[in-house]
Amino acid sequence: MAKKSLIEKANRPPAFRVRQYNRCKLCGRPRAYMRKFGVCRICFRSLCYRGQIPGVRKASW
């Protein structure tokens, strides 16, 4: 879990637009963010395994 202070800081509008960065909507993690889904890779993986993201399934080839 990310620090509460950093999550709140990311929610505030920055003084300059280039300082804005994405955070996971579930856990607040700033790294490995997937724009299309709005979550980090760890939360994405757990949501996929539970079948909560429609159209996503495990690859096999």
Curated annotation (Swiss-Prot):
Entry annotated with the keyword S-adenosyl-L-methionine: no
Source organism of the structure: Desulforudis audaxviator (strain MP104C)
Known function: Binds 16S rRNA, required for the assembly of 30S particles and may also be responsible for determining the conformation of the 16S rRNA at the A site.
Family: Belongs to the universal ribosomal protein uS14 family. Zinc-binding uS14 subfamily.
Signal peptide start-end: none
Complex and partners: Part of the 30S ribosomal subunit. Contacts proteins S3 and S10.
Name this protein carries in UniProt: Small ribosomal subunit protein uS14
Keyword list, A-Z: Metal-binding, Ribonucleoprotein, Ribosomal protein, RNA-binding, rRNA-binding, Zinc
